[in-house]
Amino acid sequence: MKVLALGGSGDMGRMAVSILLESPNATSITVADNNYERAKHFVDLVGSDKLKAVEIDVTEKNKLIELISSHDFVMNTVGPFYKFASMILDAVIEAKKPYVDICDDWKPTLDLLEMDDRAKKAGITAIIGIGASPGITNLMAVVACSKLDEVDDLITAWGYGTGERIGSKLSLYSIYNIVKLKVTDFWLKNCLII
């Protein structure tokens, strides 16, 4: 399987590509980045014959569709997701290729879920939000809810400290997302899969 790793030389992309390299199903992995030198440096550092580097500006739709079309599967770690997720999934649907991403923003998640019918009509599977949070936290929520008689609301969130050992504070961005990531029956039924 020829895998296209959009953002494959970024922080999260490098980890995902490293894991993909262990899969016998991934016969080749194209590390695509808006900075060719960064992608090439990562590919050279890893030193696997399975990897190659390409430069892509994901805002250039026709070039993106052409690149996607030459692969069997797309993994997207390009951020920020509020800026790029919808345009990338739109191109993936047009190219009719299976897709996964690690979208961690609530608003683009809702936008991506709105593309469900288009993805189904294109005959593709698109799985969004398969990182740590959302992703693992959503699966943990499903397990937790299955152990309870009734669930009215469920809130998942992640946060990080300021680096202080005592009295660490969440960033305003994290607080904003905690408030917005109120998960109800809708999220559990949809499991963030389109």
Regions found by a protein language model. Name each.
Residues 3-19:
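N-terminal Rossmann NAD(P)H-binding glycine-rich loop of SDR-like oxidoreductase domains
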Residues 10, 35-37:
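Helix N-cap at the beta1-alpha1 junction of Rossmann-like dinucleotide-binding domains, i.e.
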Residues 28-30:
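Short beta-strand element of Class I
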Residues 55-70, 77-80:
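Conserved Rossmann-fold cofactor-binding substructure of NAD(P)-dependent oxidoreductases
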Residues 80, 91-109:
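ADP-ribose/adenylate-binding Rossmann-like module
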